[in-house]
C-alpha cells in the first residue's frame, strides 16, 4: 500500500509539472508541505525523481524571477494608438501655428498697404499745395508788376501835368471895350492844409469889393488849383521815396488796394512755410508710429516661425518612436 502511494505520488510530480503548482509548493511554508506528506512515502521517493523535481523547480523559479523582474510586454496596437494620438495632437498644433502666422502676415501686408496709401495721399496733397503756392506766387508777381507799371504811369502823368500847370499859372480875363469885367487881384491868401492834403479853410482878402459874385468865383477856382498842385507835389515826393527804398510800401495807397503787395507776399510765404512744416512733422510722427507697429508685427511673426521650427524639430520620427518603445517598454495604464 505504501509502495503504491509512493509510486503514485512520484508519477504525479513527474507527469504534471504545472508551474503554478510548483511555484505554490515552493513558495508555500515548509510546515504545510511537510504536513501533507506522509512519513512513510518520503523515504521511498526515488533519487532520480527528486533530482528531476529539483531541476524543474529551479528552472521554474528562475523563470518566475525573470517574469517578476521584467514589466509585462506592451501590446503593439496600444503603442500604435499612442503614436497616432501624439501625431494628431502635434499636427493640430502645427496647423494652428500656421493659421495664426498666416493671419499675422496678412495683417502686416494690410498695414503696409495702408501706410503706402497714406504716404501717397500725403505726397499728392503736398504736390497740390506746392502747385497752389507757385500759382499764388506767380499771381503776386504779376500784381506787383502791374502795380509798378501803374505807379510809373501815374508818375509820368503827374510830371506832365505839373509841367503843363507851370506854364499856365496865370489866367487872364477877357479884355474888351464893351465888357467891364477884369481879373481881381488877390492881395492875401492864407490856407491851412492837413496831413492828407485836404483843405481846412480859406481866407481871402480882396483889395476892392467890386465885382460881386464873379470875383468870388474866380478866387475860389484859383485857391482850388493851388491846393491840387500842393497835393500833387506831396504825392510825387512820397512815390519817389517808395520807389527808391524798394521794399517799403508807398505812402499814398489807394483805398481799393488794402495791403501792400510786398507785405502780402511776405505774409503768404511765411504762412505757407509754417503749414508745410506742421504737415511734415505730422507725417514724420505718423511714419514713426507705423514703422514701430510694423516692427512689432514682424517680431511677433518671427517668434511664431521660430516656435514652429522648434516644435517641428522636437517632434520625433515614427521610426524613432518605435525603436525607443521597443528598447524601453513601459507598462500599460490601468
Swiss-Prot record:
Gene Ontology biological process: asymmetric cell division
Keyword Magnesium annotated: no
Basic and acidic residues: bias regions: 53-63
Lineage: superkingdom: Eukaryota
GO cellular component: cell cortex
Region described as Disordered: 53-74
Effect of disrupting the coding gene: Decreased accumulation of ASK7/BIN2 at the plasma membrane and impaired polarization of ASK7/BIN2 in asymmetric cell division (ACD) precursors thus leading to its nuclear localization in the meristemoids.
Record carries keyword Coiled coil: yes
Main location class: cytoplasm
Record keywords: Coiled coil, Cytoplasm
Residues forming coiled coils: 273-300
Intracellular or extracellular location(s): Cytoplasm; Cytoplasm, Cell cortex
Protein role: Acts as a stomatal lineage scaffold which regulates subcellular localization and transient polarization of kinases (e.g. ASK7/BIN2 and ASK3/SK12) involved in asymmetric cell division (ACD) in a BASL-dependent manner.
Name of the molecule in the record: Protein POLAR-like 1
Organism: Arabidopsis thaliana
Amino acid at each position: 500500500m505504501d509502495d503504491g502511494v509512493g509510486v503514485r505520488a512520484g508519477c504525479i510530480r513527474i507527469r504534471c509539472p504545472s508551474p503554478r503548482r510548483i511555484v505554490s509548493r515552493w513558495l508555500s511554508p515548509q510546515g504545510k508541505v511537510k504536513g501533507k506528506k506522509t512519513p512513510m512515502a518520503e523515504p521511498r521517493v526515488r533519487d532520480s525523481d527528486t533530482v528531476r523535481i529539483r531541476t524543474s523547480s529551479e528552472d521554474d523559479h528562475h523563470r518566475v524571477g525573470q517574469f517578476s523582474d521584467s514589466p509585462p510586454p506592451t501590446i503593439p496596437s496600444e503603442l500604435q494608438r499612442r503614436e497616432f494620438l501624439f501625431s494628431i495632437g502635434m499636427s493640430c498644433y502645427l496647423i494652428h501655428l500656421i493659421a495664426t502666422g498666416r493671419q499675422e502676415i496678412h495683417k502686416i501686408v494690410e498695414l503696409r498697404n495702408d501706410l503706402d496709401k497714406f504716404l501717397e495721399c500725403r505726397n499728392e496733397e503736398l504736390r497740390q499745395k506746392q502747385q497752389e503756392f507757385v500759382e499764388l506766387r506767380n499771381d503776386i508777381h504779376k500784381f506787383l508788376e502791374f502795380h509798378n507799371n501803374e505807379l510809373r504811369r501815374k508818375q509820368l502823368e503827374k510830371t506832365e501835368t505839373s509841367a503843363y500847370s507851370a506854364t499856365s499859372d496865370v489866367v487872364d480875363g477877357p479884355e474888351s471895350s464893351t465888357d467891364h469885367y477884369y481879373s481881381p487881384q488877390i492881395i492875401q491868401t492864407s490856407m491851412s492844409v492837413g496831413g492828407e492834403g485836404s483843405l481846412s479853410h480859406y481866407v481871402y482878402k480882396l483889395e476892392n469889393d467890386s465885382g460881386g459874385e464873379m470875383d468870388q468865383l474866380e478866387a475860389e477856382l484859383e485857391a482850388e488849383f493851388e491846393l491840387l498842385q500842393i497835393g500833387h507835389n506831396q504825392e510825387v515826393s512820397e512815390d519817389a521815396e517808395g520807389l527808391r527804398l524798394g521794399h517799403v510800401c508807398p505812402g499814398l495807397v489807394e483805398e481799393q488796394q488794402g495791403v501792400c503787395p510786398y507785405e502780402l507776399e511776405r505774409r503768404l510765404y511765411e504762412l505757407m512755410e509754417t503749414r508745410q512744416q506742421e504737415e511734415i512733422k505730422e507725417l514724420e510722427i505718423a511714419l514713426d508710429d507705423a514703422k514701430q507697429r510694423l516692427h512689432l508685427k514682424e517680431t511677433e511673426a518671427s517668434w511664431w516661425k521660430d516656435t514652429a521650427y522648434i516644435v517641428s524639430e522636437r517632434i520625433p520620427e515614427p521610426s524613432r518612436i518605435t525603436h525607443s518603445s521597443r528598447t524601453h517598454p513601459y507598462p500599460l495604464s490601468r
